[in-house]
Amino acid sequence: MKIEGFENTDEPFCTVNRVEIDGIKIAEVYWHAVEFSELDFVLIFFGYNKENQKSITGLIEEYHLKKANCIIGCIDIACEAIDYKDNEYEAFSSLMKQFDFHLDSASSGDFENLVEFCTSTKTGCPTIILSDFKSESGTEIHFVTEESSSINELKSLISESCKKLFSHREQKFPKVMIAFLTNGYELSLDEIQELFDSLDDFITDDSCMMVLNNKISGQNKEVIKVSLIFCEEG
């Protein structure tokens, strides 16, 4: 079954088309200019199993034909567990290499926050551009989102989430993309620097790129939301 529908963003030049096909959720992020319309991001959220691998491969090929600039796979954390000692892992790994980025063990909330991150690179004030998402095919990413009305609490939440996620990791990340998302609240440079400093244990020097977007409709005007994409070495 295919379900489709558009949603508007805060800016007329960016739209998100939602598609659902047999339980596979897809978000298509379009960039519109005066003379052209481009499919910049395609995010595919699915529960991996041996039966649907062919369907996912077909979708990726279809979006390549549509000239999608960046295809991101989000694997549902609630899906069937993968046996790493089995040939299934080889098939899974082969599928992941077909995406530009893939986020393993993703929740539906992670998927929605990642869609918001991608649209913010089009509607906010970014230093992140589309080419920053382009690395070696199959690059694994890790995703963290936290929000609070207090900078100190936000720093603590981000630090704790990162410590938990990267508890068995010693190497720092070479590239991190950060979105600061608010609804009318404009972060000061000092506040941004404080939030960057909370990441010192996890990122290399000068590895950060960021986007500021203070037009997140529906968000509490006092709340600051921070989403981070940590990229493995490509």
Q: What is each residue range found by the language model?
A:
Residues M1-G234:
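Tubulin/FtsZ superfamily GTPase core signature
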